[in-house]
Amino acid sequence: MQLIRGRSNVSQCLSSCVLTIGNFDGVHLGHQAILRHLRQKADELNLPMAVMLFEPQPREYFLGDKAPARLMRLRDKLYYLKQAGVDVVIIAKFDRTFANLPAQQFIEDWLVRKLNVKFLSIGDDFKFGAKRQGNFALLQQAGEKFGFTVEDSRSFCLDELRISSTAIREALANDDLKLAEKLLGRPYRILGRVIHGNELGRT
């Protein structure tokens, strides 16, 4: 899996793609279903399958310490995206410049010129661009103008509960590990590096 950081490196590494955009925090069952469908589209079109992430996540940029805790670190997210068959991950730096980027400019600069997207899978509630003025309808209009297909990635439910990173956080907050694991599609793990101390407790 190829990792591309920053706008300036995209065109050098990628000539065209099928794309989805999001946080993919937890890479849960809903994310996995989206990625399986995108993999099929990529194979049909004979194009690489790409995921665009933002660092920091938009909520972290706007809310700071009040933003929801992540379900996993970026390193672990990249591991699970690779396991899902993703060919390319683009990490866009979410800073003041990006936050103030007009929605139409994001479409033309990123989706059209840089990525040359042919198929875009996105939630119908996706908002983007300065003041969140960009939406699903604007992307559909752009697709007709610039020649790419836009598809609603839809929500997925398990036992009538919408699968989402928020639902998993709530399950963990309520000590309901079984529900969190069902929504994730695997056991919940906190991964980290072991730091060895001075071993003063040894006899």
Question: Predicted segment positions?
Answer:
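A short acidic, often aromatic-flanked loop/helix-cap motif at beta-alpha or helix-coil junctions
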Residues: N9-Q12, R96-A99, F156-L161
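N-terminal catalytic cores of NTP/NDP-binding nucleotidyl/phosphoryl-transfer enzymes
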Residues: S11-R73
